[in-house]
């Protein structure tokens, strides 16, 4: 591994709240077609949402984005008995989100813009909300806070003492493909507020918003990277950012950019089209919260102009209070065909020694352990655990108390040459405890070349780690030795609870959600619910 890390300390790059409009014109993403009402409405109305301890709330289940479920209500020995319990079909095509499960309710976004609240046991529909454009984030559920009791004359206090204080509703927070963030009433599905965090035409919220202490932390990504090779596109002007929103109103409290300078005209390309810069450093993952140090961590993407900036291809720490940049560790990797950017969330983990480490994997296939107390200094890992020079860590890793589990996607640009693999690493040293190559069955939908890349986010529970593959198979591996415990091919057609024709396919982006004995996964336009023996 060739690596030239750079530590840069910079002052505040926060933007005042008044500089960010709350509700500007709608974004430019494709508007979904009108969807039919769901046919499987629950027989009874939903109760208010009670936020408990055993749940999967948001992207990583906890603030540290470990993607670890310590209380799955499934024993590792019963994982081979998992069977399909029910399926639900999304209207409007394939979906790439991840279910959130709180209080026996599943909350799910969709690429068609419909947001769902389903009963986790039966798959019936409590409510839907149709956003004007698609969403692919996980949903975070949180209480908006308790309203204050109005001033009451002393002589009436005893009379009214039995009355409960009226509480604000719990809310479901998510982002969409135009850079907007929403809050819905989690019980009823009605819109509470909408806030436009970024107005760039290519802005989108790819990383799930993270809720902490009455603030919603939102990272902003983009699809402008797709146009960098287009000579007719005036490239590039998008800058990545992270923002803090007030959960009660959606007001932007601060916003910090990952490219410090505003883009300016640079030159005209061979087609005579004006080009711009600097730009890039999009954030495609969910922020990780470090309450102890008062910061959040994000991983950034590459420069879209070919000129590296101080925060491109980096892990960066921003202050939770005001968005000031605390430190940044740039991790450019030379000699790799794939990007050195980060699209998966950093994982904050406590070692057996009591010290903490930031675990980060990038598209290059290189993984790192960084010291949160010393500006992201690289821990003494041999070769930085360069597990696979063919690439790459895509959407998310997982960590329990013993190991860090990293799935590698291989080169998606080479059909039939993407084997994929799952690695268990020592989070202290980066040494591999085991690794298992992805099995290579033929894909159900084709006899031709088939990718077995493992780009989907990983999920771990005691004794078992779940990793999906582009071949459509969801597999559970032993956390001890990496042996495959269970294998389910999702690339098939399913009978659904709501009567929508649903078919699975390649597994990508959002990973498995495990709560109360159930395993939930999205494949194609199907949401699949598994339990032991399908009961």
Enumerate the predicted regions with their spans.
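Extracytoplasmic/lumenal domain signature
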Residues: 74-91, 115-136, 140-168, 174-203, ...
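Extracytoplasmic mature domains of secreted/periplasmic and thylakoid-lumen proteins
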Residues: 207-208
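Blade/loop signatures of beta-propeller domains
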Residues: 20-84
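Short, solvent-exposed loop/turn elements at domain surfaces
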Residues: 57, 63-69, 93-97, 116, ...
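Aromatic-lined ligand-binding clefts that engage carbohydrates, nucleic acids, or primary amines
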Residues: 106-107, 172-173
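Bacterial N-terminal signal peptides
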Residues: 4-14
């Amino acid at each position: 591994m060739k690596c030239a890390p750079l530590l840069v300390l910079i002052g505040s790059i926060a933007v005042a709240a008044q500089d960010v409009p709350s509700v500007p014109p709608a974004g430019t993403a494709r508007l979904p077609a009108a969807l039919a009402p769901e046919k499987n409405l629950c027989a009874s109305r939903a109760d208010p949402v009670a936020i408990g301890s055993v749940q999967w709330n948001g992207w990583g289940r906890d603030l540290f984005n470990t993607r670890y479920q310590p209380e799955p209500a499934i024993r590792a020995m019963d994982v081979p008995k998992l069977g399909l319990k029910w399926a639900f079909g999304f209207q409007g095509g394939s979906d790439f989100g991840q279910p959130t499960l709180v209080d026996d309710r599943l909350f799910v976004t969709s690429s068609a813009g419909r947001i769902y609240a389903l009963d986790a046991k039966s798959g019936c529909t409590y409510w839907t909300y149709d956003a004007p454009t698609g969403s692919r984030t996980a949903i975070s559920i949180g209480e908006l806070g308790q309203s204050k009791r109005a001033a009451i004359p002393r002589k009436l206090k005893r009379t009214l003492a039995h009355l409960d204080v009226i509480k604000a509703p719990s809310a479901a927070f998510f982002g969409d493909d135009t850079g907007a963030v929403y809050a819905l009433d989690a019980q009823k599905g009605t819109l509470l507020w909408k806030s436009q965090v970024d107005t760039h035409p290519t802005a989108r919220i790819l990383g799930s918003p993270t809720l902490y202490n009455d603030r919603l932390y939102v990272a902003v990504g983009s699809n402008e990277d797709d146009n960098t090779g287009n000579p007719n596109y005036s490239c590039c002007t998008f800058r990545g950012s992270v923002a803090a929103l007030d959960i009660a109103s959606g007001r932007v409290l601060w916003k910090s950019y990952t490219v410090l300078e505003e883009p300016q005209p640079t030159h005209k390309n061979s087609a005579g089209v004006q080009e711009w810069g600097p730009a890039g450093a999009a954030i495609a993952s969910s922020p990780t919260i470090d309450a102890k140090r008062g910061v959040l961590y994000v991983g950034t993407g590459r420069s879209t102009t070919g000129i590296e900036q101080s925060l491109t291809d980096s892990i960066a720490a921003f202050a939770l209070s005001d968005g000031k940049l605390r430190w940044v560790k740039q991790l450019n990797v030379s000699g790799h065909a794939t990007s050195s950017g980060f699209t998966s969330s950093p994982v904050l983990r406590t070692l057996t020694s009591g010290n903490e480490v930031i675990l980060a994997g990038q598209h290059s296939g290189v993984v790192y352990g960084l010291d949160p107390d010393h500006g992201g200094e690289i821990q003494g890992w041999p070769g930085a655990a360069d597990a696979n020079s063919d690439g790459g860590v895509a959407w998310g890793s997982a960590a329990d108390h013993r190991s860090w589990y990293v799935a590698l996607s291989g080169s998606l640009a080479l059909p039939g040459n993407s084997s994929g693999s799952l690695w268990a690493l020592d989070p202290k040293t980066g040494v591999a405890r085991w690794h298992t190559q992805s099995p290579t069955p033929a894909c159900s939908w084709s006899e031709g070349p088939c990718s077995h890349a493992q780009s989907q986010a990983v999920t771990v529970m005691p004794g078992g780690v779940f990793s999906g593959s582009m071949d459509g198979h969801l597999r559970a591996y032993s956390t001890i030795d990496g042996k495959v415990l269970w294998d389910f091919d999702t690339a098939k057609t399913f009978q659904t609870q709501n009567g929508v024709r649903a078919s699975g396919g390649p597994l990508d982006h959002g990973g498995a959600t495990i709560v109360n004995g159930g395993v939930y996964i999205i494949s194609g336009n199907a949401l699949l619910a598994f339990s032991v023996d399908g009961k």
